[in-house]
């Protein structure tokens, strides 16, 4: 959520920032409501001053033995008017908050201006894609042939965009989760959380999924939501708390299943593991001081990249342009892994700095050493999406005979060096 005071003081700057997103977003309604609210508050203060003045007259009149009935009636009328105005103020404030919750974050000044993903900027590459002397099979095909992925039975059980992992496929998924957690905990210094997979509406609002993206979420009949990412419960872990400056940055890593309706994704990557309704992910979440958050974004992105380096998977890092930026993000790097059967790089992680956008919604602050309270900056990134990593391994390490070589760092988890 954007700061109303900042919007009021910098309307042109805010509108200019929102215009960079290439969407029709106007702050005019908020400014109008804010002006209405301030006028109502001024009227309330004026009436309260009159009320206080008249209240002081009552003891004097009583002391003089005079009738206070008329004055008491005036005070009753004033009290009723103040209550009515307070009610109007509450209505206007609720309307302001309702609109604020639908307005996205302002892109950071370092974000390139562009209309969509075609104008994202490649930052760097790592690793060289293999050029095999045989035709690469797509991961779903080789997975089914090896008997480690079963899409057909998953479709029978649950419908489209679900998968059964079987045998060494299930072990590979589990090995990746454990490897990613161990790497981030032991090498990168994150603290592990194992979060609930169901959250309340307030938590989804806190991280920016609601109200704007409710159609993309799976919701229970009693208003709980299946999490689309561990970002939601882990960020809300410190909701409505005041943290200590000396404890920042706080770094969490969490494995969770993720659930997404993928509304509007028809026809996109419909086969295989790339776009599923349910998938596993290891998430990195940070709480940082505002002055440190962009350094922390670079470190977080490097931590996610490190997983791919250890696995030996070629990838590139892309800086998202303003038109492709997520709703809550001020700046995002996408990490894209090379997928041979696609002939292109495919997103496997998004690493974002939300600045104070989520912290304002979730009321997460910290106390500076001088006693001043400030909102933290929140960051997160996939470290990594597990199903997509499985897909990348099956495609990048498949052999001519149809087997798949297990990356060296996974062999102690897998108990084998090859899937055949």
From Swiss-Prot:
Pathway: Aminoacyl-tRNA biosynthesis; selenocysteinyl-tRNA(Sec) biosynthesis; L-seryl-tRNA(Sec) from L-serine and tRNA(Sec): step 1/1. SUPFAM superfamilies: Class II aaRS and biotin synthetases, tRNA-binding arm. GO terms for cellular component: cytoplasm. Coiled coil: none annotated. The lineage of its organism: Bacteria, Bacillati, Bacillota, Bacillota incertae sedis, Caldicellulosiruptorales. GO terms for molecular function: ATP binding; catalytic activity, acting on a protein; serine-tRNA ligase activity; transferase activity. Belongs to the class-II aminoacyl-tRNA synthetase family. Type-1 seryl-tRNA synthetase subfamily. Consists of two distinct domains, a catalytic core and a N-terminal extension that is involved in tRNA binding. It catalyses: tRNA(Ser) + L-serine + ATP = L-seryl-tRNA(Ser) + AMP + diphosphate + H(+); tRNA(Sec) + L-serine + ATP = L-seryl-tRNA(Sec) + AMP + diphosphate + H(+). PROSITE patterns: AA_TRNA_LIGASE_II. It comes from the Bacteria. Homodimer. The tRNA molecule binds across the dimer. Keywords: Aminoacyl-tRNA synthetase, ATP-binding, Cytoplasm, Ligase, Nucleotide-binding, Protein biosynthesis. L-serine binds at residues 229-231, 283, 382. ATP binds at residues 260-262, 347-350. It is found in: Cytoplasm. GO terms for biological process: selenocysteine biosynthetic process; seryl-tRNA aminoacylation. Its main location: cytoplasm. Its EC number is 6.1.1.11. This is Serine--tRNA ligase. It comes from Caldicellulosiruptor saccharolyticus (strain ATCC 43494 / DSM 8903 / Tp8T 6331). Catalyzes the attachment of serine to tRNA(Ser). Is also able to aminoacylate tRNA(Sec) with serine, to form the misacylated tRNA L-seryl-tRNA(Sec), which will be further converted into selenocysteinyl-tRNA(Sec).
């Amino acid at each position: 959520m954007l700061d109303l005071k900042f919007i009021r003081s910098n309307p042109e700057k805010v509108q200019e920032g929102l215009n960079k997103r290439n969407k029709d977003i106007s702050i005019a309604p908020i400014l109008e409501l804010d002006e209405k609210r301030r006028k109502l508050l001024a009227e309330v203060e004026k009436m309260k001053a009159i009320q206080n003045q008249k209240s002081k007259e009552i003891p004097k009149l009583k002391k003089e033995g005079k009738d206070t009935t008329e004055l008491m009636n005036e005070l009753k009328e004033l009290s009723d008017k103040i209550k009515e105005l307070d009610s109007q103020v509450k209505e206007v404030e609720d309307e302001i908050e309702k609109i604020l919750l639908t307005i996205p974050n302002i892109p950071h000044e370092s974000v390139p201006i562009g209309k969509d993903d075609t104008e994202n900027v490649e930052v760097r590459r790592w690793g060289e894609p293999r050029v095999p002397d045989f035709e690469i099979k797509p991961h779903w095909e080789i997975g089914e042939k090896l008997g480690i992925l079963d899409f057909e039975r998953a479709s029978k059980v649950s419908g489209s965009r679900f998968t059964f992992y079987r045998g060494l496929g299930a072990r590979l998924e589990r090995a990746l989760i454990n490897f990613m957690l161990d790497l981030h905990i032991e090498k990168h210094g994150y603290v592990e959380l194992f979060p609930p997979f169901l959250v309340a509406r307030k938590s989804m609002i806190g991280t920016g999924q609601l109200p704007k993206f409710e159609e993309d979420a799976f919701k229970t009949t009693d208003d709980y939501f299946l999490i689309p990412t561990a970002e939601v419960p882990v960020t809300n872990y410190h909701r409505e708390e005041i943290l200590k400056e000396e404890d920042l940055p706080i770094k969490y890593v969490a494995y969770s299943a993720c659930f997404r309706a993928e509304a509007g994704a028809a026809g996109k990557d419909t086969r295989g593991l790339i776009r599923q309704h349910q998938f596993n992910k290891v998430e990195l979440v940070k709480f940082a001081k505002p002055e440190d958050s962009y350094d922390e974004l670079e470190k977080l992105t490097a931590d996610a990249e490190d997983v791919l380096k250890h696995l030996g998977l070629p990838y590139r890092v892309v800086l998202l342009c303003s038109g492709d930026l997520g709703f809550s993000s001020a700046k995002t790097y996408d990490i894209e892994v090379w997928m041979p059967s696609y002939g292109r790089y495919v997103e496997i992680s998004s690493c974002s700095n939300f600045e104070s956008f989520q912290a304002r919604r979730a009321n997460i602050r910290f106390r500076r050493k001088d006693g001043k309270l400030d909102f933290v900056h929140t960051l997160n990134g996939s470290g990594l999406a597990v199903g997509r990593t499985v897909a990348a391994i099956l495609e990048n390490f498949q052999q001519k005979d149809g087997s798949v070589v297990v990356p060296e760092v996974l062999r102690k988890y897998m108990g084998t060096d090859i899937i055949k």
